[in-house]
Design a protein with these regions (language model features):
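Flavin (primarily FAD) binding-site architecture
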Residues: 269-287
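Core beta-strand elements of the Rossmann-like FAD/NAD(P) dinucleotide-binding domain
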Residues: 28, 257-266
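Dinucleotide-binding Rossmann-like beta1-alpha1 core, especially the glycine-rich loop
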Residues: 70-138
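Active-site/ligand-binding neighborhood in enzyme catalytic cores
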Residues: 145-252, 261, 270, 404
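Beta1/beta-strand and adjacent pyrophosphate-binding region of the FAD-binding site
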Residues: 25-36
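Conserved flavin/dinucleotide-binding core of flavoenzymes
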Residues: 41, 252, 300, 316-480
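Glycine-rich FAD pyrophosphate-binding loop
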Residues: 47-68
Length: 620
């Protein structure tokens, strides 16, 4: 009897398990839009987990914004861990980088300099570059959490400043500034278009990575080789399939690409923001996402490969790795030609690329060749042709890579990490630590694939909420004043520092960039402070205002108790008490003589009144 009961229970359990198994056996489906590195990674990871994946790419080829170079410098496992893991997975061999390319070098007026050469032959330029690097390191050190760079109101304020203004304050020599501008353009965008907070955040990410680790080896064939390795693993790829619309309902996502329509459980959107803006989303994206699509800054880059019969540059100038030019040549490196000859890859970035926007490809190449020929007279005779990639004028990309402009971290930080219903987002622009890099694209593809699996498992996905700095925070930012004084060369007079946040727009920023005299002269409001004085005696008001303006130096000792607003208020009550005796003796001339003496007393409360009004502005 007992055995029969157990047998019946076993049959029931088996039936339940069978039903559950049938439900689980239903293969999950996903569509990946975008065949760049991020999309390829997401598709690969989902397929590896048993998903049926369809990848749609608008162009005839895959790999996205891969460069022209037939071999690419890559970092070691410390600098690019995800990239190196995929290289190991696909058994793609790399070649160790020679030592001379592992640090940046320079081409100054056609003369090649290593960092060691620069220190000997142009010590002033070398010293200025070192000073810049040290100051940048101090700036990066202030960001303790790169995933939440605006952790306090002081750092939050850096997002309102562009990098060019910060560089202006460093007073760099002309050549050093040109080289530094070129480096920033190449890695991000024009300094005047780049948020100082974003620049500091990126510097903090790489602060623990030695410059040499960023070019530790070479990948023969470039990133195209890695893209092809992904492609070989994927089962369903549709090229020449530009997506025009995405419709989400309760259980599915439907994608229209050309005349074809595809339906799946979930979707990974792995296209640049400008391309995303051309896709009709239903339900539509909210105002914040649409604002990010339209206004998020992308770096500009034109990449040109000039081909020569023979090397026309100095054979001793081993120009490779990163070589920054102080002229219009931008950043360049020598690219080995696979079939003999010699190639040079030139990157025009930032406003250098924007200026050339009106030029056709051949005109642009001619402009670059003219500059190269000025330094190497054999260039035109040995020149055989060119290849070009113009990311910024490509309607499908609208730029080369993410480069947050002033105020944009405040609005759009980590916005694209959150899935919207059944759609997850990938692409270098969605990665917090390594945007604009191959590493960032690979990481974002992994994250999006993981999010889609979480959504399929029924998990509610909430974004990492980064709370904006609280309003009262500036009052407790005394330690941050030291940070700014070291950054922008302010005086070490600590009592003056709290005046920085007094008026966030005029006073704080003028102080931030070395305008230390401006806040001290700012007792212009002091003229308004004595305005209550006319009530007791209109005549003495004129002599009171004049002395306050003439000796602003006296505000320095008075500002010591600037934080104590209550004692300052007491001094304001003493003013009428002292002026009353002046009323009682109007006829006597002697008290009139004493009146100027009392104006000396009036100066002090007036100056204190100026310091009292400043903290009030901060609170407001």
């Amino acid at each position: 009897m007992l055995s029969g009961w157990l047998r019946a229970c076993a049959l029931i359990v088996t039936g339940l398990v069978s039903v559950s198994t049938l439900a689980d056996d239903k293969q999950r489906t996903a569509i990946v839009v975008g065949g760049g590195m991020a999309g390829l990674t997401a598709a690969y990871e989902l397929q590896a987990k048993g998903w049926q994946v369809t990848l749609l790419e608008a162009k005839p080829s895959l790999g996205g914004r891969s460069g022209l170079a037939t071999s690419e410098w890559i970092g070691n496992t410390k600098a690019q861990p995800v990239l190196n893991r995929y290289l190991d997975t696909f058994k793609l061999a790399t070649v160790p980088a020679p030592e001379f390319v592992r640090t940046p070098s320079y081409l100054i007026d056609g003369v090649y300099f290593t960092q060691a050469d620069l220190a000997v032959k142009q010590p002033a330029t070398a010293e200025a570059i070192k000073r810049y690097n040290d100051t940048l390191d101090n700036l990066a050190r202030s960001i303790t959490d790169p995933e939440n760079p605006a952790s306090n109101s002081t750092l939050f304020a850096l997002d309102q400043i562009n990098v060019a203004n910060w560089l202006d304050r460093l007073n760099l020599p002309a050549t050093a500034r040109q080289l530094i501008n070129q480096q920033i353009r190449t890695r991000y965008d024009e300094p005047s278009r780049l948020s100082l907070l974003y620049f500091a955040q990126q510097s903090s990410v790489y602060r623990s990575v030695d410059e040499r680790d960023l070019r530790a080896s070479r990948l023969p064939g470039g990133s195209t080789v890695l893209a092809q390795a992904f492609v070989k693993q994927l089962k369903t790829i549709k090229t020449n399939s530009p997506v025009s619309s995405v419709v989400q309902d309760k259980d599915h996502v439907t994608v229209k690409a050309g005349t074809a329509s595809y339906t799946a459980d979930y979707l990974v959107m792995a296209v640049p923001l400008r391309s995303l803006g051309k896709i009709q989303m239903t339900p539509s994206l909210d105002a914040q996402h649409m604002g990010a699509i339209k206004s998020t800054n992308y770096g500009w880059r034109d990449q040109i490969m000039l081909k020569f019969k023979t090397p026309v540059w100095d054979s001793k100038a081993r120009m490779s790795g990163e070589v920054f030019s102080n002229t219009g040549l931008g950043m360049l490196w020598i690219e080995p030609a696979l079939k003999g000859g010699a190639n040079v890859v030139i990157n025009l970035s930032g406003d250098n690329a924007r200026i050339m926007q009106a030029f056709g490809d051949k005109q642009l190449v001619d402009q670059v060749l003219i500059r190269l020929h000025a330094f190497y007279p054999e260039a035109r005779g040995a020149y055989t042709g060119y290849e070009i990639r113009r990311y910024s004028v490509d309607p499908s990309t609208g730029g080369s890579y993410l480069a947050f402009g002033p105020g944009q971290i405040s609005k759009y930080w980590r916005l694209w990490e959150r899935p919207i219903q059944r759609v997850a987002f990938a692409g270098e622009h969605t990665d917090t630590l390594y945007p604009g890099t191959l590493e960032g694209a690979l990481r974002s593809g992994q994250r999006a694939a993981s999010q889609v699996q979480d959504l399929a498992a029924g998990k509610s996905f909430e974004p990492v909420k980064v709370a904006p700095p609280k309003a009262p925070a500036p009052a407790s930012q005394k330690s941050d004043c030291n940070f700014f004084t070291s950054l922008f060369g302010c005086t070490s007079d600590k009592p003056v520092e709290p005046a920085k946040p007094q008026a966030e727009k005029p006073g704080f920023f003028s102080r931030l960039f070395g305008g230390s005299d401006t806040p001290v002269a700012a007792p212009a409001p002091v003229e308004k402070a004595p305005e209550p004085a006319p009530a007791p005696a209109p005549v003495p008001v004129a002599p009171v205002v004049a002395p306050v303006v003439t000796p602003p130096a006296k505000t320095e000792p008075v500002k010591k108790p600037a934080a104590k607003a209550e004692p300052a208020k007491k001094t304001q009550h003493k003013e009428p008490a002292k002026k009353e005796p002046a009323k009682k003796e109007p006829v006597k001339k002697e008290p009139v003589k004493k009146a100027p003496a009392k104006t000396d007393d009036a100066k002090k409360p007036a100056a204190k009144a100026a310091t009292d009004t400043a903290p009030a502005d901060v609170k407001s």
